[in-house]
């Protein structure tokens, strides 16, 4: 028994080292095509979340791996049949893919082996899990504006900082850090929550979006925020409360991923081995900070709803492709700053700009210990100076990040470059035309779903207690995550 525990510990340390020095956190988003059909979206959700036989799934995965390897080898061999530069580039790309495939399989094998001997936290069965504080969505989907329909929008914002972030009990998001944890060392600007509430003036209900300057947020934390204002949500006919983050790598860790890996490796292992309550496990969340986040976000949602007023909505797209890059070829990304501009009837009130863009907030580097809102902080300053409120919704980013070459100055720090980058995008937004009028039509639908975790590294990390996400055991797979998916239509040709 002692020998088994010793082996487990050695393998665990190896894994922590591999993960700490070879991994960075990534976020994946998805956007629906404009005018997408709700029924098709629902069908895709059903297919995504359907439970499949584990052996069949395993065979399919193996075949996919084999086919991918064969395709890569073909590319490499094909490069020798021509001296064409494009083919040579394909050869180098193929070699890189083969290398990363091999490393990925090595890490995956280590994690699978470790999971068999490492004491992991217990999970409830999927059948016993109950979703709470769910979004209900619109009672009907309308394809034209109702008689007398008008856009009504409200805005509010508040700081998420408590003043205690440098006390040594908080962690910074971004890349994993081992053996030394990433405690914040300086506060460079602000981390905020920005909220807008909107309706089309009908009884179809109010939709709320709260966007946090944060590394990430688990679904259970989203539902906790909703629970704080459950009565208000019901009384105000709020049919959807959406809470997302801008995924700043320089924000306080609200997802849990960047906790002290030594405490996870040793402390959580012991607690899991003796069956202690999972709530006692260590992760990167600071309880006082999270409580402040819950309360502040809930209060800001209430304020935004109470600030709603009638006006007109406009939509514009501004091409900023020279300021965006994909870190992985081919270069594929949305080149636009997609803006909804609400202009209130009351000219004494400020317009509200809602901007969707897919640009990673990693200006200070993935390993920074400085706290900053990154480039969105500086965009907001430009927009505020022009007399408007600002909310940014992060798009499908993953490896898509900022192209700072046009604004970079030799000798500047990364923070100064992030400032210049944000200022530039802000200036472009301020100069943009307000766009075309959007009909007052607002439809939204939601579904609670379970998503299978097929990344063994993430599965293992979650099972140590490092992540704040809830997870359940399923019949044919070892872990599924309870989450939710939504689909929204604005006007006659916009969908999110």
Predicted segments with their positions:
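Positively charged n-region of N-terminal signal peptides that target proteins for export
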Residues: 1-5
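Sec-dependent N-terminal signal peptides of Gram-positive bacterial secreted proteins and lipoproteins
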Residues: 7-25
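Sec-dependent signal peptide cleavage junction
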Residues: 20-41
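N-terminal, intrinsically disordered, polar/charged segments of Gram-positive cell-envelope systems
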Residues: 35-54, 75
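Conserved beta-alpha junction segments in alpha/beta enzyme cores
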Residues: 61-244, 248-420, 433, 440-496
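Anionic-ligand-binding alpha/beta catalytic cores of soluble enzymes and soluble regulatory domains
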Residues: 425
């Amino acid at each position: 028994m002692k020998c088994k525990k010793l082996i487990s510990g050695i393998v665990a340390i190896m894994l922590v080292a591999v993960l700490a020095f070879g991994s960075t956190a990534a976020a994946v988003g998805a956007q629906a095509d404009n005018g997408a059909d709700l029924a098709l979206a629902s069908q895709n959700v059903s297919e995504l979340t359907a439970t499949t036989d584990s052996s069949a799934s395993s065979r399919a995965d193996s075949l996919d791996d084999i086919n991918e390897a064969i395709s890569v080898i073909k590319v490499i061999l094909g490069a020798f049949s021509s001296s064409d530069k494009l083919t040579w580039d394909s050869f180098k790309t193929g070699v890189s893919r083969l290398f990363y495939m091999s490393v990925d399989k090595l890490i995956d094998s280590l994690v699978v082996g470790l999971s068999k001997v490492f004491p992991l936290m217990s999970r409830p069965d999927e059948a016993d899990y109950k979703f709470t504080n769910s979004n209900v969505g619109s009672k009907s989907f309308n394809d034209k504006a109702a008689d007398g329909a008008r856009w009504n929008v409200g805005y509010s914002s508040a700081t998420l900082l408590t003043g205690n972030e440098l006390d040594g009990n908080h962690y910074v998001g971004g890349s994993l850090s081992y053996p030394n944890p990433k405690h914040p060392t300086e506060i460079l600007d602000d981390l905020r929550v920005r909220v807008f509430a909107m309706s089309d003036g009908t009884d179809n209900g109010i939709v709320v979006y709260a966007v946090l300057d944060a590394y990430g947020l688990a679904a259970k934390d989203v539902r906790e925020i909703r629970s704080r204002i459950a009565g208000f949500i019901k009384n105000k006919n709020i049919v959807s409360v959406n809470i997302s983050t801008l995924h700043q790598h320089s924000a306080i860790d609200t997802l849990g991923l960047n906790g002290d890996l030594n405490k996870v490796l040793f402390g959580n292992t012991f607690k899991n081995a003796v069956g202690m309550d999972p709530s006692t496990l260590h992760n990167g969340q600071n309880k006082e900070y999270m409580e402040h986040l819950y309360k502040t976000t809930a209060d800001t949602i209430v304020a935004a709803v109470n600030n709603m007023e009638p006006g007109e909505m406009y939509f514009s797209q501004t091409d900023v492709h020279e300021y965006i890059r994909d870190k992985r070829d081919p270069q594929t990304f949305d080149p636009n700053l997609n803006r909804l501009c609400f202009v209130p009837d009351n000219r004494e009130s400020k317009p509200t700009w809602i901007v969707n863009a897919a640009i990673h907030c990693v200006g200070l580097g993935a390993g920074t210990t400085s706290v900053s809102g990154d480039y969105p902080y500086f965009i907001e300053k430009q927009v505020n100076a022009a007399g408007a409120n600002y909310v940014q919704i992060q798009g499908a980013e993953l490896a898509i990040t900022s192209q700072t070459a046009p604004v970079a100055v030799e000798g500047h720090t990364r923070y100064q470059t992030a400032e210049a980058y944000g200022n530039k995008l802000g200036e472009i937004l301020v100069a943009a035309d307000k766009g075309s009028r959007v009909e007052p039509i607002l439809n939204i639908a939601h579904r609670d779903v379970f998503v299978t975790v097929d990344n063994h590294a993430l599965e293992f990390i979650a099972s140590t207690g490092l992540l704040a996400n809830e997870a359940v055991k399923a019949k044919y797979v070892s872990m599924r995550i309870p989450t939710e998916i939504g689909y929204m239509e604005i006007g006659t040709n916009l969908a999110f």
